[in-house]
Amino acid sequence: MSASETPSPSSGSPFWRFSLRFYRQSEVADACIALQEQAGVDVNLLLFLLWHAAQKRALSRADVAELERRIAPWRNMTVIPLRTMRRALKSPPTLVAGARAELFRTKIKAVELEAERLQQEAMYELAGPALLGVAASSLEDAARANVAAYAAMCGGAFPQPAIEILLAALVGRGRKPEE
């Protein structure tokens, strides 16, 4: 997701709108990409956990594992192949190069973003009107608990500098997540 290609933050679910606004904050995109590349994090799932944290909801490792189980088929069949294709087209084969290859890559990027949006909308529907998890004492406590639950589900710890950037951006946001 890049700020120049993102749709209007006024469309979609509250979770999608939160994601667009949050991702546009300074250093957030780089931190998300670092976590994706270094630790295999599903950025959409991480954003979902941070969105819940913004509403002071802490999810358990079992909650996160169930979310992962439900979203993995879509991610693996659509989002990851589109991302792989988009990245490969940064250095296209010589048969189709230059502006035509870049135009095609831009179209793939738009489809990738739409696949991510569809995943996020489905995740929002999974939560339903009642949010997942349990009430936490603070936004930061919920965020740390949700990230820890995700890391535990993945079998390890996430790179701390990237996590701290995301937590600082979330805690310092100063607005409700649905705004």
PLM features: residue spans?
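Short alpha-helix boundary/capping elements
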Residues: 40-44, 52-57, 75, 113-116, ...
